[in-house]
């Protein structure tokens, strides 16, 4: 389903009665922790003059843009395009938490904002005027970067800044004075997107697929898969049934998954006595376990022609 694209592994699911019910997250998927909606309401009131419902007339309700926060109709705003773009800029510069979901339904004339926890989200490169964000001058000018810079922007932040704190800042409290004009040029190149936002975006898989309307591009096509699917060699050349079967069998070839397995209360655990490091492997083996956890065995097969 489109709402699960890039978030749930489309291959790694069991066959039989549990098909589609037992799911695995994709490689880059993250679960949000959530924060209170009150700071967002205060931001909309103070900076964007959002009207609460008890302050609005019938004409306002009919013509102004509705704002829903965590599913609650919280107010009405004018100039939704300006406010939407400003909120997205705040998200891409960590003034509001980077896991905040902001989507604008133009046809139905409402903006949805989600701050709650438990949402599945994933990172994507942004695209502007058919140019991917990884061509950003702020990125190219940096001699050293880290993941925090890629998702929160390149302006210098306080030492106590942490993206996991989910705090709402002002521009001056986070970056100091006279930094407002530098936000656009130094914003993040990667945005965390959930299903609600993805419904309003046009996401390309490859660089050649970018069109005028494209808003985002995948970091890498393999990130739509989970850990086990990315261990399969050339999954695009095999039937989907065999890929799903391979994911199920790979779990039984894992070596010592935990040193205290005798004391755990797992429902099931399969341990291979003599595991080996695969001779043929994908790049993800290096990233997942640094090739320090063997799994499976390398069979030796002799083939002879007999007539």
Residue ranges of predicted features:
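Conduit-forming functional cores of very large proteins
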Residues: 1-307
């Amino acid at each position: 389903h489109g709402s699960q694209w890039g978030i749930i592994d489309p291959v790694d699911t069991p066959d039989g009665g549990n098909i589609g019910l037992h799911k695995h997250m994709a490689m880059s998927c993250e679960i949000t922790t959530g924060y209170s909606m009150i700071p967002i309401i205060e931001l909309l009131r103070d900076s964007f003059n959002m009207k609460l419902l008890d302050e609005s007339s019938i004409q306002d309700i009919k013509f102004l843009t509705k704002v829903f926060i965590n599913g609650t109709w919280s107010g009405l705003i004018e100039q939704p395009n300006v406010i939407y773009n400003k909120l997205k800029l705040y998200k891409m510069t960590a003034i509001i938490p980077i896991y905040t979901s902001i989507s604008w339904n133009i046809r139905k004339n409402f903006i949805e904002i989600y701050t709650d926890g438990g949402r599945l989200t994933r990172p994507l490169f942004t695209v502007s005027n058919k140019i991917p964000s990884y061509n950003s001058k702020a990125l190219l000018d940096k001699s050293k970067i880290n993941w925090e810079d890629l998702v929160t922007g390149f302006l210098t932040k306080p030492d106590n800044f942490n993206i996991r704190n989910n705090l709402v800042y002002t521009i001056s409290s986070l970056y100091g004075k006279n930094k407002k004009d530098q936000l656009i040029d130094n914003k993040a190149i990667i945005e965390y997107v959930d299903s609600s936002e993805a419904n309003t975006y046009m996401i390309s898989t490859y660089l050649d697929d970018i069109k005028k309307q494209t808003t985002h591009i995948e970091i890498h096509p393999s990130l739509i898969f989970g850990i086990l699917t990315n261990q399969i060699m050339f999954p695009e050349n095999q039937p989907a049934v065999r890929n799903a079967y391979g994911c199920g069998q790979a779990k039984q070839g894992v070596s010592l998954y935990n040193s205290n397995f005798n004391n755990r209360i797992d429902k099931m655990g399969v341990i291979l006595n003599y595991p080996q490091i695969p001779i043929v492997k994908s790049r993800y083996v290096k990233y997942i376990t640094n090739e320090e956890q063997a799994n499976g065995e390398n069979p030796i097969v002799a083939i002879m022609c007999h007539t």
